[in-house]
Amino acid sequence: MIASKFGIGQQVRHSLLGYLGVVVDIDPEYSLDEPEVDELAVNAELRAAPWYHVVMEDDDGQPVHTYLAEAQLSGEMQEEHPEQPSMDELARSIRQQLQAPRLRN
């Protein structure tokens, strides 16, 4: 079993670019199509580690879905981000849904 460093609903930062994001799903290892030679995912060691589906915002404040290796992320210590309140709201909403799932008939 592979342990992931970050959890669903957790806020993270891209280590190199500094973008704030929210983890929305986790793959225990790289699970997309075969990567191109110039992509980070060609590294076998990185492919075997967890990969994260992360929602971030572009420069216009629009949500962008990214797929990032664990090595590309760092944990975010702050809980409030006045410059990106939609990321705070998304993280809160996901955590709330995980704590109190709705029953369906």
From Swiss-Prot:
A cellular-component GO term for this protein: cytoplasm
The keyword Manganese is annotated on this UniProt entry: no
UniProt KW keywords: Cytoplasm, Stress response
Sample GO molecular function, one term: DNA binding
GO biological process, one term: response to heat
Presence of the UniProt keyword Cytoplasm in the record: yes
Pfam families hit by this protein: YccV-like
UniProt-annotated location(s): Cytoplasm
Function of the protein: Involved in the degradation of certain denaturated proteins, including DnaA, during heat shock stress.
Homology family: Belongs to the HspQ family.
Name of the protein in question: Heat shock protein HspQ
Organism of provenance: Cronobacter sakazakii (strain ATCC BAA-894) (Enterobacter sakazakii)
